[in-house]
Curated annotation (Swiss-Prot):
The keyword Isomerase does not apply. The keyword NAD does not apply. It is found in: Secreted; Cytoplasm. This is Salmonella pathogenicity island 2 protein C. It comes from Salmonella typhimurium (strain LT2 / SGSC1412 / ATCC 700720). GO terms for cellular component: cytoplasm; extracellular region. Keywords: Cytoplasm, Protein transport, Secreted, Transport, Virulence. Induction: Highly induced 6.5 hours following entry into host cells. Induced in macrophages. Induced when residing in the host ileal loop, when in an acidic environment, during phosphate starvation, and in low magnesium. Repressed by methyl-3,4-dephostatin. One of its GO terms (biological process) is protein transport.
Amino acid sequence: MSEEGFMLAVLKGIPLIQDIRAEGNSRSWIMTIDGHPARGEIFSEAFSISLFLNDLESLPKPCLAYVTLLLAAHPDVHDYAIQLTADGGWLNGYYTTSSSSELIAIEIEKHLALTCILKNVIRNHHKLYSGGV
């Protein structure tokens, strides 16, 4: 089985991941993770999953700087990065293809939890600075 096929089978076996399908080529996928828009891409011996954080309008530079510092300052948060696209901000998590299915599932649960926390931070930051509180 190819590396792409193996990873697709692993991801399809994780209950939180739904609606997974190839996007353009077999090395990238779009999906939902517990209802959150997500995408994945496989590299040599690694893959990334990105969970959608927010559109760019609700992610101004001061908020983006704050969220980035939260990620950088926490000693237990690693292998995550914010990616900005035309769609908005995404939280990328990086994983090795040699990890067990169980470990990948656990790490994706942590990734989802961190995404939810950051979405809440962004929402509160937006309310505070847009006069919504």
